[in-house]
């Protein structure tokens, strides 16, 4: 079974299953299609979190973006920050993790 907010993305996932892919392959195809047809709902510029249940075991993936290479926690503290600024500061912008998450899921659990 495949479910998404867009029929094209759902169809993409179903095609992957019909062609021998597993649930992880289908989820990646569905998510990638959503990034094209509905980027306001599921874009490649975001993060990815997954729970995968295989052979009685649950695996988790946190593909949240990391801080940029120029961000230094000690310098931020020295600048007077006591928590991460959420607005109007480049330090709060992360590197997107979605595509790296697809790669990690595919390498570990994909079959196609």
Give the positions of each predicted feature.
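Noncatalytic scaffold domains of N-terminal-nucleophile
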Residues: 1-11, 15, 23-112
């Amino acid at each position: 079974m495949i479910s998404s907010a867009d029929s094209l993305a759902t169809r993409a996932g179903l095609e992957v299953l019909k062609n021998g892919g597993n649930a992880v392959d289908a989820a990646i195809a569905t998510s990638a299609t959503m990034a094209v047809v509905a980027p306001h709902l599921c874009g490649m510029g975001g993060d990815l979190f997954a729970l995968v249940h295989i052979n009685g075991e649950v695996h988790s993936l946190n593909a949240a973006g990391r801080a940029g290479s120029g961000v230094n926690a000690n310098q931020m503290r020295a600048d007077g920050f006591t928590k991460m600024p959420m607005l109007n500061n480049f330090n709060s912008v992360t590197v997107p993790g979605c595509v790296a998450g697809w790669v990690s899921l595919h390498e570990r659990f994909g079959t196609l």
